[in-house]
C-alpha cells in the first residue's frame, strides 16, 4: 500500500493547504492568528445547519467535549474526521500494511499528504451515514414551503456539514503553522472550558428535572427547598454528592491537580553544546510523554463503533444492541459504550433512568465497567506507542534532532546513535507507563463524574492542553530572544 501512496502523492499534493511561513513568525503575530481562529470557531459553532429538523439526533452528543464542534451547527462533525483519519493511519502503520519510514523526510511528506486526503474522505464518511440513516433529518415543513423534495434538503445538509468539516481542517492548519500549539487542541480546550463554565452557572432547568443544570444554582435551589436535618442524613448526603454535584466538583479539582502533577514529573537528560563552551541544557522526558492526545484516539474509536450501532438501530437493525435516549441498553453496543458518570455503572442509578434500563442485570453493568477499564488502559498504552512512533517522538528521531542542534550528552561520544541508545533507556518505558496512567485517570474521572458532563477524557484533555499551551507560550516568548535559541529548539531562524 505504501507504493500506492507514493504513486498517488503528486495528486495528494494538489489538495490546497495552508502555506508554511518561510521564516520565524513573531509571537504577537502567532497570538493574533490563534485568537482570530478561536473567535471564528465560536462564530461557526453558532451557525445552524439550514434545513435541519429539530427532531434530529446527535449521535456524538456524549462525545462533544472530545470532538469539539457544536450540535446542530455547520461544524457539528468537529475534529472527528481528523481524529478518525489519524486512527486509521496509525493502525495501518502499526500493522505494517503501510511500510513508510517516517524518519525519512520524503516518506513523512507522503504520509502527511495522504493523511490530509483521508481527512476529506472521512468528512463525507461521517456525514453521509447520519443523513442516510435518518439521524440528521431534513425539515419537512421547510421542504414543503420551498416546493422541493426532502432529498434536496438532505443534500443541502450534507453540503453544509462538508463545508464546516473543511473549514475545521484549514483552521487547524492555520493554528499549527502560523499560531501557537495546534488547532485540534485549541478547539477541544475551548469547547470544554465553555462546558465547564455552563456546568457551573447554568440556571436553566432541564426537562424532567426540578433543579437547575448548573452546580451553583443547584446548590441555591437545594438550600431553598431542603431542610438541613434532611440533608445531613445518609440519603441526604448521597443526594448532595451525586445529584448536588459535589462529587463532580471534587473529582474535577482532584483530576486537575493530578494531571498538573504528572505533567511536571519528568526525567531530565543533561546536554552540552559541542561548540559553544559552557552552553548546557536538559532534555525533559515527561511521565506523560505522549500527552493525553492518544486517549482521543481510544474514545474516538469507541465513538465510531457505537455510532455505527446507533445508525444501524435507526434503520431497524438491532442485532448489535438497542438504544434508548441515545444510550445502548442491550447487546454488544452496551458493553462497548464508554462509562461517563455514576449513572453508567452504579446499578441503582443505572436502573433509575427508565424501564429499559431497569431490566439490565447487575452483572452486565459491572462487566460493562470492566470492559471500559480494559479499553482505556490497554488502548491508552497501544495508542501512546503508535503516537510516539508516528509523530517523530521516538528515540531515533529525537536523537537526530538533538544532534542537529549541536548538543550532546556529556561524557558520551558525539553521535546520533549514542544519543539514541541513551534515549531508548527511557522513552519506551515512559510511553507505556504514561499511557496506562492516563487510562486509569480517565476511568476514575468518568466513574465519578465531572462538572458540565465533559467526561473524564475531556477533562484530562483540557488540563493537559492548557498546561502545554502555557509551555508553548513560554517557549514562544523564549524564542523571541535570540536566533540561536530557535535553532536549538529545532525552529528556523
UniProtKB/Swiss-Prot annotation:
Residues 49-59, 135-151, 202-244, 314-367, 450-454 are extracellular. Its main location: membrane. The chain crosses the membrane at residues 22-48, 60-88, 110-134, 152-176, 183-201, 245-266, 292-313, 368-387, 431-449, 455-469. GO terms for cellular component: plasma membrane. This is Protein translocase subunit SecY. The central subunit of the protein translocation channel SecYEG. Consists of two halves formed by TMs 1-5 and 6-10. These two domains form a lateral gate at the front which open onto the bilayer between TMs 2 and 7, and are clamped together by SecE at the back. The channel is closed by both a pore ring composed of hydrophobic SecY resides and a short helix (helix 2A) on the extracellular side of the membrane which forms a plug. The plug probably moves laterally to allow the channel to open. The ring and the pore may move independently. PROSITE patterns: SECY_1, SECY_2. It comes from Archaeoglobus fulgidus (strain ATCC 49558 / DSM 4304 / JCM 9628 / NBRC 100126 / VC-16). It is found in: Cell membrane. Residues 1-21, 89-109, 177-182, 267-291, 388-430, 470-493 are cytoplasmic.
